[in-house]
């Protein structure tokens, strides 16, 4: 999976800004050396809004699979999702298309911080452990560590996409993906996602 700088997810398809931003994004996708500042200045002049590109990325995959985009109603949240498969024919099935839709909705609604636990900010993780230890400092040491690990597992289920409860059932996202893969007799792997929200800063 490759990632490069790209303003694509900043599109707003059902607003005046979207009508201006979409051609900018399309042009940059075709030519990554395009002068975004020149186009940004032109867009500001056309619609009278102070447009700022605070974050811009793109996703791509090597081999079978798909990269899909979703803009939520109201154009306040946008999602890019990259999912890999082993078979080209998998991507044409209704089950796979539904999976793409479901996972983008999951990302929109649940706002995960990372794909899985290996991608979490380790300093944040250690801070969560410290908070849990402080909360239960009066417990026996052995009990504290068990409680802390339980709290961390809960934290994973809140902030890691694959560990989150799937929006449509009581299983995890990881288990749902596995069930669809089994149904299609293929291997399906979520490789990466990007979530954008209007008003976010580069530090968000």
PLM features per residue range, with description:
Residues 1-204:
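N-terminal assembly/interaction segments in proteins that build large macromolecular machines
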């Amino acid at each position: 999976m490759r990632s490069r700088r790209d303003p694509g997810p900043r599109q707003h398809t059902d607003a005046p800004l979207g009508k201006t931003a979409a051609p900018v994004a399309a042009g940059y996708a075709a030519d990554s050396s395009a002068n975004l500042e020149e186009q940004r200045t032109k867009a500001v002049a056309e619609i009278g809004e102070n447009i700022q590109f605070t974050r811009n990325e793109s996703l791509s995959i090597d081999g079978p699979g798909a990269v899909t985009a979703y803009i939520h109603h109201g154009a306040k949240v946008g999602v890019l999702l990259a999912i890999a498969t082993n078979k080209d024919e998998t991507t044409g099935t209704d089950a796979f298309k539904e999976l793409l839709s479901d996972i983008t909705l999951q990302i929109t609604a649940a706002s995960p911080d990372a794909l899985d636990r290996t991608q979490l900010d380790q300093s944040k993780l250690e801070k969560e452990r410290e908070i849990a230890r402080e909360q239960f400092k009066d417990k026996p040491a052995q009990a504290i560590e068990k409680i802390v690990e339980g709290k961390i597992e809960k934290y994973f289920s809140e902030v890691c996409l694959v560990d989150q409860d799937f929006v449509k059932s009581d299983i995890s996202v990881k288990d749902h993906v596995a069930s669809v893969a089994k149904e299609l007799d293929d291997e399906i792997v979520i490789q990466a996602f990007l979530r954008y929200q209007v008003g976010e800063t580069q530090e968000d």
